[in-house]
Amino acid sequence: MVVHIAVIGTETAHVIEWLRSGSIEKIYLLHSKKTAEIDFPKKARELDKQIKKLYPGVEIIKRVIENAFNLDDTQDAISEIFYNERENGVENQEITINITGGTAIQSAAAAIAFVPPVTLILMSSFAT
């Protein structure tokens, strides 16, 4: 089983593009709490619906990151997911993390959470 972990922010299209690159059975969507400016839980729910429409039967788990500007909060959430999945028999190479969404701090936390045990998907808006 491949387990996907995606940090999301104001934009979520990158997650759909990423999922097109391979099989999907389970995805964790990590997002911030609702702010005065942006309803991140709503964005996660909307993305959940899009993913389920494209990939019926996929298991989607949404997790709130308490502080999107604190490195430890994102690292702790990813570490917990990683260890829970490992206990369920998922191998290191079956866990992928998309670090292209969320705040810069969340992306950095995701990048350093489990390098090299997991595969990092790096996407660049500068790619042609």
Question: Where in this protein do the model-derived segments appear?
Answer:
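Conformationally flexible catalytic loops at phosphate/diphosphate-handling active centers
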Residues: 97
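Long, low-complexity, Lys/Arg-enriched
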Residues: 1-94, 105-128
